[in-house]
């Protein structure tokens, strides 16, 4: 009765009314209808098609259609005699967006636990039970034609998934997978495999299996699917996915391989593909199928003929035997898996076992990517491949890996083999070399060549040393204890050298050290002993490599081989011995060197006269110090090489002029030095036409040294090469299908065609009737009449005389080395439009440089000569050490604290324009490419409570931090690519108790579980390992579906909305809320690509100050709703903390529209501000760039003292106000001071203008320098005549004291003329009291009162002068000022500040005239005031004595103003 009940339950298929499944819409690349005409069908097939269509119509699978889409339909007859209808959907599939595969491979039945009972079912007409989306049905219409079109065709469209549609398998898998999902959730301890429409269920007991199957039946029926009752399997043997499954064993189903159909490459390709598919079950090693794989070699045409060789027939027989006998085992879910690696012939073999039961085989491909693949590398590759397979099968790494290596060999492999390190990366199991004792693996054919036995990696002691060499003439030789020359059939120097090494290994039966000048041969010989040699289409190379491997393996004594550079002319016995080997294969080398030393003949002449290779000839010329400047320079990126003299380099091409008729093939040649053009019209472009054209060119232009052409057949033929060799002409070609290498002649083609059109359409010469006459007229115009840009002579004159005017020839220049990314100094050889040829220095080849990579070299002037060439301001990059950023809060934010920040940071800053370069990616914050974007980040303190309602009390901190580009990096491949995990303790799972105090947060330096990417683009990759927490639903233990997406309780990360607008957050869910990441840690971003730099834990303090930090407090409560627990989190903003972040000198913040250009590695910013601090008033529409000033330079950020528009007018006005009668001695001293002050204030005014608008550039300073001496000498004479008339300067003393505060800091306009076009003037901002303040207070309000305390005034002036300024006699001061102002040009300053200064200059002249009149009047007042004269004389004596004393000090010198 019990068994009858089970049978009844198994036969139950369900009869409940079900809802149709919801269709999945398709995505289309285009909505334009696709119509493919239906082809005619025979009457028999047409009748069958009508019957099948009516059948499908009755079942509701199709419906009548009037769709504008159409696909052909046809029928085929099965072996049973039934007909099957198929639709050709290739055209429709082409416009469907693919969904992608959901199951990229077959599931392995070996993972089914052993002895578990099984049930296997097949879904009936699965595709036809799944509906199409209504809007997609019309796309799958088809037409049933009528014979002779005697009636309208019948049209239908599919309502269900049609067979052959691109996404039908994916949609089918999705529908079936949805139907099985409740079964998987309810019976999670059962093992269910689903592939397309085949379903396998396994359970530990029979009863549980019946329960699972019954539930599965109902779910499948509810989903609208039907089970094929005749395909239910309930007893062994089971057949599933081509396998025969028993209680413990799994075998391949019996199949027969037909050999009579194996005739073409396509046939064998399909056969080997099928065999490879089942090899993991059969266990056929790669070496056992080598002959079958060899049949695939040769012609790649799929229809090319292939023959089944006897050896390959034996291997097919082996496959058939394995199909009959091979078996694998189902696993024990409680036992661990192991991986065994066997050192089989050809390549290693891997076996996955459990105890002694075989689970699966693993093999490497027969063909490799590299020419030589070391056996140890193959083992490592197989380990990595099989580890991934095991993880895919069961989700875990193997517990043990057994390898054919000793413990010491494994240790050495970890040290020396990169492939081994990759294959065993992150493996934590056991690595062993003891294989299990079983006979199932004994049939494997093992090899002993795993690690090198004969080849050594270090030189051998007390061994012979042999030098080898080979030549392209076929000679191979070695020298050492004896010499030998071998004649080989090879025309390759490397193959001849390979023969020399093989001969040495055969001739010397003892330990030897081999030295070769071929790096290729050295590397091949080192690796060949244990390597798998890749098959090559070159039979000669295959023979050589196989002979080399056999020779090495047959040796009884070890050898060592190394590489030496040839033709280096270095001293020492190794170089001499290698030259001796060279002489054995090329005795002409010495003669070529002697001839070049005598005549300096070029490389082409040496190659033609002597039997030397091109490399040897070029080496001789390049090592000659006399020839390097005349040798054709090497090519730089972006520049077409040009000749340095006439006929050094030609470019030649063929263009077409259709109007010439039969002679439309115009052959054009241009000399790249003079741009002289010659062209001939031919009837074709074959080699004979090219030679005819060149002979014409030789008659007109001469014979060139080198010609560059494209890869046309006329230029690449042997006849053309022979023709060039007869004329001793070198020939090169450009990159195929890329005309940029022929840019000069391509542009010449366009110029010539344009000239022909001009002369034909607008010329008056009617006598030029033939094509050659028209061509000659155009060439005469271009060569003898036209003068091109940047030239002063015609192309013909340049070609005949060899003289080319270059305005920059011989000048020093800065040129950029793109390889090293550095700027170097060189000398210009020639200069053209967009290019230049530069000589880097002695014994170096010239290089061609595009003009965008050139800068003029300017001799440093003034104090700049003594300074290093570094920019005034440099950006702080990710490779620099982290800087300190100070905050004004020590409770909520960690870091250095400084409360002395400016009270109003928004008022600081100067407007500047800046343009600087960088080497490594700069640190930039804001919305811009290359800048890190700020965003909101949350940190949480979680305090458990004892309340039955409230589960937790949360104290959360929200603030600005750095936005990740993506969320958590769960991608395994990327985690492996990081190759490191920062050192440091992981973030704690629970917050320390002391951090639960909401008044103080304990910030820790901890590492999160995974990194986030802050930036990943052309500027580099920036990552951060700081924890980033979010609330999420805890769905663990739930049986129903539960959303698991993380939800952020904080404000939106859009920075356009202020944090202050959010006061409350509420989160509700039927599931408890959990915090995703514990720990309170600051972000620590670092660059990992293209370079790896240090961490920068300080940057986030700049972002956190841009908005208030917010403190949230709240509880998570638990209540009951609908008989279910309901969780609510209420968070309220309880506190906001304003912050201010600052940097300190020499660091600054450049704020504005910063643009970073990675191609030129420059940073530009117009109208930016210089800041030291930011706070919540900062607008993130701007960007922040961290910069560092040059050492010893202070950049002004606060200058609340405005500059006068015209300092000279102000000085003279002050002088006129306080003209008094004074001693002439004291006047001279004050004159010197005034002149110095005029110069200083002029310099300061110009510096202020430069600081505000960045007007100063290199040209500006050069202009200034040229005219400075003449202008200032003239100005000095005028000022001196004026100064002789001044008697007293009472108010000027006060004004002088004010200016001395600035003068003591020695204004300097510090620029680097060769590396930067931007100047910033340093000025120290200091509000401390100055000594001259006392003098000012003593004299203020005394304009009309002459009763001064002269003694006290003298004492104050003396103390102030002694502390700040040394007054010396006037003549010395004038000379010192004139010398210090040698590089100051006020004319350029006048031009810069515009018409306002012109008016000021006019006012100065007027004031000077008025001053002369006043001075005349004051001379009359001297006789009326004797007591005043005596007072002034006293001051003069004081000044003289003071000046003399100070002048003796070597430390204190005259007033200098440096520019």
From Swiss-Prot:
GO biological process: DNA integration; DNA recombination; DNA synthesis involved in DNA repair; DNA-templated DNA replication
Name of the molecule in the record: Endogenous retrovirus group K member 7 Pol protein
Annotated signal sequence range: none
Known function: Early post-infection, the reverse transcriptase converts the viral RNA genome into double-stranded viral DNA. The RNase H domain of the reverse transcriptase performs two functions. It degrades the RNA template and specifically removes the RNA primer from the RNA/DNA hybrid. Following nuclear import, the integrase catalyzes the insertion of the linear, double-stranded viral DNA into the host cell chromosome. Endogenous Pol proteins may have kept, lost or modified their original function during evolution.
Positions that bind Zn(2+): 596, 600, 624, 627
Species: Homo sapiens (Human)
Keywords on record: DNA integration, DNA recombination, DNA-binding, Endonuclease, ERV, Hydrolase, Metal-binding, Multifunctional enzyme, Nuclease, Nucleotidyltransferase, RNA-directed DNA polymerase, Transferase, Transposable element, Zinc, Zinc-finger
Residues where Mg(2+) 1 binds: 469, 497, 517
Reverse transcriptase domain residues: 57-245
Integrase-type zinc finger segments: 587-628
Domain (Integrase catalytic) ranges: 642-803
Notes concerning its domains: The LPQG and YXDD motifs are catalytically important and conserved among many retroviruses.
Family, similarity comment: Belongs to the beta type-B retroviral polymerase family. HERV class-II K(HML-2) pol subfamily.
Residue ranges of domain RNase H type-1 in the record: 460-590
């Amino acid at each position: 009765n019990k068994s009858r009940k089970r049978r009844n339950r198994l036969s139950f298929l369900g009869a409940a009314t079900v809802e149709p499944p919801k269709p999945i819409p398709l995505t289309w690349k285009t909505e334009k209808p696709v119509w493919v005409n239906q082809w005619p069908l025979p009457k028999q097939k047409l009748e069958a098609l009508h019957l099948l269509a009516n059948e499908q119509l009755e079942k509701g699978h199709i419906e009548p259609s009037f769709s504008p889409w159409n696909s052909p339909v046809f029928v085929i007859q099965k072996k049973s005699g039934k007909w099957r209808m198929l639709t050709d959907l290739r055209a429709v599939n082409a416009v469907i967006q693919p969904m992608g595969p959901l199951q990229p491979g077959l599931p392995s039945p070996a993972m089914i636990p052993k002895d578990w009972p099984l049930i296997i079912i097949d879904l009936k007409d699965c595709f036809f039970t799944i509906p199409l989306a209504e809007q997609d049905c019309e796309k799958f219409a088809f037409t049933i034609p009528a014979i002779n079109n005697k009636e309208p065709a019948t049209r239908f469209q599919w309502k269900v998934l049609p067979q052959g549609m691109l996404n039908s398998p994916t949609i089918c898998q999705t529908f079936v997978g949805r139907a099985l999902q409740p079964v998987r959730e309810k019976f999670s301890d059962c093992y269910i495999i689903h592939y397309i429409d085949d379903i396998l269920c396994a359970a530990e007991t029979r009863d549980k299996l019946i329960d699972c199957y019954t539930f599965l039946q109902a779910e499948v029926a509810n989903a609208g699917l039907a089970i094929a009752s005749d395909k239910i399997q309930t007893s062994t043997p089971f057949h599933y996915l081509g396998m025969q499954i028993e209680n413990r064993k799994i075998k391949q189903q019996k199949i027969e391989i037909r050999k009579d159909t194996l005739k073409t490459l396509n046939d064998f390709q399909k056969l080997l593909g099928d065999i490879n598919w089942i090899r993991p079950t059969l266990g056929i090693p790669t070496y056992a199928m080598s002959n079958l794989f060899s049949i695939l070699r040769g012609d790649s045409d799929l229809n090319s003929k292939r023959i089944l060789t006897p050896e390959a027939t034996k291997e097919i027989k082996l496959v058939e035997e394995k199909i009959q006998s091979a078996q694998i085992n189902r696993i024990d879910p409680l036992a661990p898996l192991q991986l065994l690696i066997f050192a089989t012939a050809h390549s290693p073999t891997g076996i996955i076992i459990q105890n002694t039961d075989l689970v699966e085989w693993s093999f490497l491909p027969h063909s490799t990517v590299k020419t030589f693949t070391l056996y140890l590398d193959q083992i490592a590759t197989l380990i990595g491949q099989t580890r991934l397979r095991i993880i895919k099968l069961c989700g875990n790494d193997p517990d043990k890996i057994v390898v054919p290596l000793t413990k010491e060999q494994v240790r050495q492999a970890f040290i020396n083999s990169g492939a081994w390190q990759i294959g065993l990366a992150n493996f934590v199991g056991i690595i062993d070399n003891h294989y299990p004792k079983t006979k199932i693996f004994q049939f494997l054919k093992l090899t002993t060549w795993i690690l090198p036995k004969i080849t050594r990696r270090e030189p051998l002691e007390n061994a012979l040393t042999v030098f080898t060499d080979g030549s392209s003439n076929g000679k191979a030789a070695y020298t050492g204890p004896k010499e030998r020359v071998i004649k080989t059939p090879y025309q390759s120097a490397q193959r001849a050298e390979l023969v020399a090494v093989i001969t040495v290994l055969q001739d010397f039966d003892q330990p030897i050290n081999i030295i070769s000048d071929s790096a290729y041969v050295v590397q091949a010989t080192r690796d060949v002993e244990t390597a798998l040699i890749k098959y090559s289409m070159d039979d000669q190379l295959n023979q050589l490599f196989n002979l080399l491997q056999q020779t090495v393996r047959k040796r009884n004594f070890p050898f060592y081989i190394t590489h030496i550079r040839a033709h280096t002319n270095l001293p020492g016995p190794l170089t001499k011995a290698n030259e001796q080997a060279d002489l054995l294969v090329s005795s002409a080398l010495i003669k070529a060197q002697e001839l070049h030393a005598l005549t300096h003949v070029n490389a082409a002449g040496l190659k033609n006269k002597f039997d030397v290779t091109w490399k040897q000839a070029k080496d001789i010329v390049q090592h000659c110090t006399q020839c390097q400047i005349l040798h054709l320079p090497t090519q730089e990126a972006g520049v077409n090489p040009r000749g340095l003299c006439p006929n050094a380099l030609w470019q030649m091409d063929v263009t077409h002029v259709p109007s010439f008729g039969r002679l439309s093939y115009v052959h054009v040649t241009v000399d790249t030095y003079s741009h002289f053009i010659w062209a001939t019209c031919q009837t074709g472009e074959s080699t004979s036409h090219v030679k005819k054209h060149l002979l014409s060119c030789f008659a007109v232009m001469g014979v060139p040294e080198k010609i560059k052409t494209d890869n046309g057949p006329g230029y690449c033929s042997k006849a053309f090469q022979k023709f060039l060799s007869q004329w001793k002409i070198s020939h090169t070609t450009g990159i195929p299908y890329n005309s940029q290498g022929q840019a000069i002649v391509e542009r010449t083609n366009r110029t010539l065609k344009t000239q022909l059109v001009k002369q034909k359409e607008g010329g008056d010469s009617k006598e030029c009737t033939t094509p050659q006459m028209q061509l000659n007229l155009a060439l005469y115009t271009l060569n003898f009449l036209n003068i091109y840009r940047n030239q002063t002579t015609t192309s013909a004159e340049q070609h005949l005389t060899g003289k080319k005017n270059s305005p920059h020839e011989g000048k020093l220049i800065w040129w950029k080395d793109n390889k090293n990314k550095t700027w170097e100094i060189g000398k210009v050889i020639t200069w053209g439009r967009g290019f230049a040829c530069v000589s880097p220095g002695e014994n170096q080849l010239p290089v061609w440089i595009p003009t965008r990579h050139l800068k003029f070299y300017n001799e440093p002037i003034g104090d700049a000569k003594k300074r290093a060439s570094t920019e005034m301001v440099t950006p702080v990059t990710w490779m620099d050490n982290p800087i300190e950023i100070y905050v004004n809060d020590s409770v909520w934010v960690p870091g250095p604290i400084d409360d002395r920040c400016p009270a109003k940071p928004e008022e600081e800053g100067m407007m500047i324009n800046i343009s600087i370069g960088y080497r490594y990616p700069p640190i930039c914050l804001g919305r811009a490419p290359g800048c890190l974007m700020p965003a909101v980040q949350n940190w949480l303190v979680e305090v458990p409570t004892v309340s039955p309602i409230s589960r937790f009390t949360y104290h959360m901190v929200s603030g600005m931090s750095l936005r990740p580009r993506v969320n958590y990096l769960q991608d395994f491949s990327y985690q492996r690519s990081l190759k490191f995990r920062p050192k440091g303790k992981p973030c704690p799972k629970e917050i320390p108790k002391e951090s639960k105090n909401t008044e103080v947060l304990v910030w820790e330096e901890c590492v999160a579980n995974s990194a986030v990417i802050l930036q990943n683009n052309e500027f580099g990759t920036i990552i951060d390992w700081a924890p980033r927490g979010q609330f999420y639903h805890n769905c663990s233990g739930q049986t129903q579906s539960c959303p698991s997406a993380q939800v952020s309780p904080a404000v939106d990360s859009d920075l356009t909305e202020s944090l202050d607008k959010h006061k409350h957050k509420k989160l509700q869910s039927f599931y408890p809320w959990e915090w995703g990441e514990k720990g309170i840690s600051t972000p620590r971003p670092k660059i990992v690509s293209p370079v790896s730099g240090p961490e920068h834990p300080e940057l986030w303090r700049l972002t956190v100050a841009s908005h208030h930090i917010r403190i949230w407090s709240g509880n998570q409560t638990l209540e009951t709703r609908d008989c279910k627990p309901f969780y609510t989190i209420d968070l309220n903003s309880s506190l906001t903390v304003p912050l201010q972040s600052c940097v300190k000198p020499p660091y600054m913040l450049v704020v504005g529209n910063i643009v970073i250009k990675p191609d030129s590695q420059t940073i530009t910013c117009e109208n930016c501000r210089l800041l030291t601090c930011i706070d919540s008033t900062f607008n993130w529409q701007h960007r922040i760039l961290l910069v560092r000033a040059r050492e010893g330079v202070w950049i002004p950020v606060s200058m609340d003292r405005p500059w006068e528009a015209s300092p000279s007018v102000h000085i003279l006005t002050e002088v006129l106000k306080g003209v008094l009668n004074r001693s002439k001695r004291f006047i001279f001293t004050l004159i010197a001071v005034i002149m110095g002050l005029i110069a200083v204030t002029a310099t300061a005014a110009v510096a202020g203008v430069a600081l505000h608008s960045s007007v100063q550039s290199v040209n500006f300073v050069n202009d200034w320098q040229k005219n400075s001496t003449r202008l200032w000498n003239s100005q000095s004479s005028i000022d001196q005549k004026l100064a002789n008339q001044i008697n007293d300067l009472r108010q000027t003393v006060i004004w002088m004291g004010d200016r001395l505060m600035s003068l003591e800091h020695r204004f300097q306009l510090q620029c680097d003329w060769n590396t930067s076009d931007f100047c910033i003037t340093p000025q120290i901002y200091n509000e401390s009291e100055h000594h001259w303040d006392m003098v000012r207070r003593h004299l203020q309000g005394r304009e009309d009162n002459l009763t001064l305390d002269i003694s006290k005034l003298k004492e104050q002036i003396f103390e102030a002068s002694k502390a700040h300024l040394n007054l010396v006699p006037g003549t010395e001061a004038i000379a010192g000022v004139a010398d210090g102002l040698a590089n100051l040009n006020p004319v350029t300053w006048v031009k810069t500040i515009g018409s306002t200064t012109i008016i000021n200059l006019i006012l100065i002249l007027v004031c000077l005239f008025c001053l002369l009149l006043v001075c005349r009047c004051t001379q009359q007042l001297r006789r009326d005031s004797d007591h005043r004269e005596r007072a002034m004389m006293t001051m003069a004596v004081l000044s003289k004595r003071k000046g003399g004393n100070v002048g003796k000090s070597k430390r204190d010198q005259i007033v200098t103003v440096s520019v």
